[in-house]
Amino acid sequence: KISDGEFVLFCGRSGCGKTTITRLVNGLIPQFYQGELHGRVLVDGQEISNIPMYQIAAKVGSVFQNPRTQFFNVDTDSEIAFGIENEARPPEKLAERVEQTTEDLHIQKLRNRNIFELSGGEKQKIAFASVYAMNPQIYLLDEPSSNLDMTSIQELREHLRLIKKQGKTV
């Protein structure tokens, strides 16, 4: 059992199941990936297989190992706003949330850029920002420091402290 506000790190060799665990918690297994599940996965007291994906997405934010696999837009601002756009927020609230997110994460220099022109580390930052903008209770980060240089890893550490301070589960 992982409690609210807890910070958990899964370590292990390649292929041991770390990504599989994240896919179970964010509902991709069994809804998108086939597999045989023995046991139950509960999020917020509910069995994950019984929760619609849109409800899971409101509670669980995922940053994938390869950030390109989660992008839906070409420019960074649209990508950061994408998840909250699906919540039908008014345009001015979207703009405010994108601004607040980029300020909180100190990534203003990445605003209004073409995603395909970003470095791997910058793409990782935008992927994290798109999840942060949605303000989920649970963050699932699959190899979040991949593609990051040492300075960016330090920045990620500060971002994780920020969400931990907000009482989020990581």
Model-derived features: positions:
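Conserved ABC ATPase "signature" region
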Residues: 92-110
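Conserved ABC ATPase signature
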Residues: 114-118, 122
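Conserved ABC transporter NBD signature motif
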Residues: 34-46
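Hydrophobic anchor residue at the start of the ABC signature
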Residues: 128-129
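Helix N-cap at the start of a conserved alpha-helix in ABC-type nucleotide-binding domains
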Residues: 150-152
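Conserved catalytic motifs of ABC-family nucleotide-binding domains
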Residues: 135
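Catalytic Walker B motif of ABC-type/P-loop ATPase nucleotide-binding domains
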Residues: 139-142
